[in-house]
């Protein structure tokens, strides 16, 4: 048998990018031989094994044939007679269809095996499909878009983009399971330039199928005095990219993506103003998250950011009582960590605008100082001093928090 490192590990090594983990293909072996050498079988649809020492995954070389629509509609063939080139031919992109042999000690040996000119495409910074079988797996649309977010200076080859459009037109994107859509979108959001993912999805028409709420934002105008970039879709991409540049978490980046969804449903006769878009955004985020099975922490932050980001931008105008009400409404007193992420998302919103990416955002510091003061109030001690009347306790605690915030910010009211 021969063992090869394949795919992303070879690509990243050639690019000079740190290799996170490796995928291995075994040619000329049977499942029984793998087990005899101590490998543990874990594959469900095709033979994948864990190395007895490193626990890395090793897959037997295989070919695959499309048998039904969607992500799971494949029939796999694996046997000792499947060659390395045949295994590489089933892969999505030429830059992912390269291999190097692995020595018994685990070192890469010999030249790069590159039957589809992946090295040339790496040099040209091009995503190019390996063959016509590319159209058989709709997940590849999402994967290419995600790769675009990681390798932002790459472009999609014209013929590859044409195939992606054909797949979308044929309804293949509609067959994607929700969990896989979210998985790829989430991974793309965590790359260096998430806007590139959405640009590729828009180019091939897939964004309108998997995230129609986001796709609808392009072409929706905003007031130029607040948004020099004008177009809502452009603004949202700038917000997401700003959040990525700051290294913010997935919940923050998802909130950045969804905070203005309601602007797409603003009546045409009131544009470019968007009165009430916050509430409309909330009503769009809820079914989106349910449809894609978005994790609760992402959904909850997105909802509070969508509802409150306009208010948060205006906190410099708020007195102590209004600030405490804002904290109570956004659950900041009980969930300060989530509130910190809310500040990050709103700061990204303020700076994700043409020419305004370095503008001061004093709202964040004002809220941090005020929240520390409000949370310093000992609600338990106040409750013990007031008695059993719940409303009296709430009122006394609220007044104490207002006074604490007033003193912390030296606000005269």
UniProtKB/Swiss-Prot annotation:
The keyword ATP-binding applies. One of its GO terms (biological process) is RNA repair. Its cofactor is Mg(2+); Ni(2+). InterPro entries: CCA_bact, HD_domain, NT_sf, PolA_pol_head_dom, PolyA_RNA-bd, tRNA_CCA-adding_enzyme. Comprises two domains: an N-terminal domain containing the nucleotidyltransferase activity and a C-terminal HD domain associated with both phosphodiesterase and phosphatase activities. A single active site specifically recognizes both ATP and CTP and is responsible for their addition. Monomer. Can also form homodimers and oligomers. Catalyzes the addition and repair of the essential 3'-terminal CCA sequence in tRNAs without using a nucleic acid template. Adds these three nucleotides in the order of C, C, and A to the tRNA nucleotide-73, using CTP and ATP as substrates and producing inorganic pyrophosphate. tRNA 3'-terminal CCA addition is required both for tRNA processing and repair. Also involved in tRNA surveillance by mediating tandem CCA addition to generate a CCACCA at the 3' terminus of unstable tRNAs. While stable tRNAs receive only 3'-terminal CCA, unstable tRNAs are marked with CCACCA and rapidly degraded. This is Multifunctional CCA protein. It comes from Burkholderia ambifaria (strain ATCC BAA-244 / DSM 16087 / CCUG 44356 / LMG 19182 / AMMD). The lineage of its organism: Bacteria, Pseudomonadati, Pseudomonadota, Betaproteobacteria, Burkholderiales.
